[in-house]
Amino acid sequence: MSRLVVVSNRIAPPDEHAASAGGLAVGILGALKAAGGLWFGWSGETGNEDQPLKKVKKGNITWASFNLSEQDLDEYYNQFSNAVLWPAFHYRLDLVQFQRPAWDGYLRVNALLADKLLPLLQDDDIIWIHDYHLLPFAHELRKRGVNNRIGFLLHIPFPTPEIFNALPTYDTLLEQLCDYDLLGFQTENDRLAFLDCLSNLTRVTTRSAKSHTAWGKAFRTEVYPIGIEPKEIAKQAAGPLPPKLAQLKAELKNVQNIFSVERLDYSKGLPERFLAYEALLEKYPQHHGKIRYTQIAPTSRGDVQAYQDIRHQLENEAGRINGKYGQLGWTPLYYLNQHFDRKLLMKIFRYSDVGLVTPLRDGMNLVAKEYVAAQDPANPGVLVLSQFAGAANELTSALIVNPYDRDEVAAALDRALTMSLAERISRHAEMLDVIVKNDINHWQECFISDLKQIVPRSAESQQRDKVATFPKLA
């Protein structure tokens, strides 16, 4: 049985709490436990890159991690992955800060990681690479003679040609991506955007619906929307409330709660969301004193100016809205710039009447799925969801909105707050059915199954050699 090798920018620690944060870690650990194998990635620490890999083995899984130098971390991670690729892939070219040394550092670190992984690989390993930090990784492995099956999963959106092709190094990135055997995307729109970018640059031959050749390299493209653990989330949400939360729930028994949580990021549409809530207060005054909107947005990348700017903007907007509409005994908007335990958030989801998830652009958005999974099926809340979140392709029974249209979002909030129990139950049941069928294990099993079906490049070349060899004529 082939071993699975997973490569990601960061690895979850090899302990019993590794998957407690949910998301990617749960899926990866599930795949590794099924096949046995290796999880390879950055340790999260800076230091001497020449030090031996730190290896930990538990059961049939080995964790191998490495340090990065301060310069490599800054150029590869901060300056290129997060200051070029992240804003560009989220359609924010105005925030891209391209610097040639950062591009060189990005390529250098991908080459370094390939050098470190190479001695650990076995001939029949199946290799699964994750996310935008490692776009050139298969190319570096191929340069080193690796013919194993290599798959790639992009967790963020893939932009259309007019966005992607504005990157100074777009052509190199596209050609290097074709060194993967299988390219996975969150949505069909992302998959088609990649193929459009490729077709604008070179001739792409499509052998079947999702099998292609470019620059003489054969690869497949497919859609793999990442899922969650709905049963585990429901279990966490239904457990007893901590004393403080129980007291708050009692105090707010006559107040309808609108709730949002995500890390502080310009892609999440938080300023637009605040303005939409203000439009709700302005156009639907019957809700005054009867609703409360709580926004949790812990700081991420706090040293980056764009993130500092949005934090200050939100603080100012929250103060302005509360000053304009607040009353004695009623604060309409609570903005909390701090981290909360994930299990506690699931309980808060369960007692929120509306889940408000309106990113301007998002690969999937697992918060939307978690909100649905956390609800009481007999008395569920309503999900208001951006059309630009990947989850909108699956959760079609949510109230789908354009986050740039504050009046539309306000109208959806009013509808959610006044929706009948029967309609809430019906919409929730339809979404929960999708989430249960397409859970995190289904996601990883589909990807691994498709990757296993691909013929390794070494076998492909042998087949071509046989076809091209003719007996010598007498």
From Swiss-Prot:
**Classification via SUPFAM superfamilies:** UDP-Glycosyltransferase/glycogen phosphorylase
Q: What chemistry does it catalyse, as a reaction equation?
A: D-glucose 6-phosphate + UDP-alpha-D-glucose = alpha,alpha-trehalose 6-phosphate + UDP + H(+)
Q: Which is an annotated Pfam family here?
A: Glyco_transf_20
Q: Which residues bind UDP-alpha-D-glucose?
A: G22, G23, R263, K268, F340, L366, V367, A368, K369, E370
Q: Where does D-glucose 6-phosphate bind?
A: R10, Y77, D131, R301
Which biological pathway?
Answer: Glycan biosynthesis; trehalose biosynthesis
Involved in alpha anomer selectivity, annotated site positions: W86, I156
* Listed GO MF terms: alpha,alpha-trehalose-phosphate synthase (UDP-forming) activity
Keywords of the record, alphabetical order, are:
Glycosyltransferase, Transferase
Q: Which domain of life is it from?
A: Bacteria
Matching entries from InterPro entries are given as:
Glyco_trans_20 (IPR001830), Trehalose_OtsA (IPR012766)
Give the E.C. number(s). 2.4.1.15
A single GO BP: trehalose biosynthetic process
What family does the database annotate? Belongs to the glycosyltransferase 20 family.
The record describes the protein's role as:
Probably involved in the osmoprotection via the biosynthesis of trehalose. Catalyzes the transfer of glucose from UDP-alpha-D-glucose (UDP-Glc) to D-glucose 6-phosphate (Glc-6-P) to form trehalose-6-phosphate. Acts with retention of the anomeric configuration of the UDP-sugar donor.
**Self-association and partners:** Homotetramer.
What name appears for this protein in its UniProt entry?
A: Trehalose-6-phosphate synthase
Q: Which organism is it from?
A: Pseudomonas savastanoi (Pseudomonas syringae pv. savastanoi)
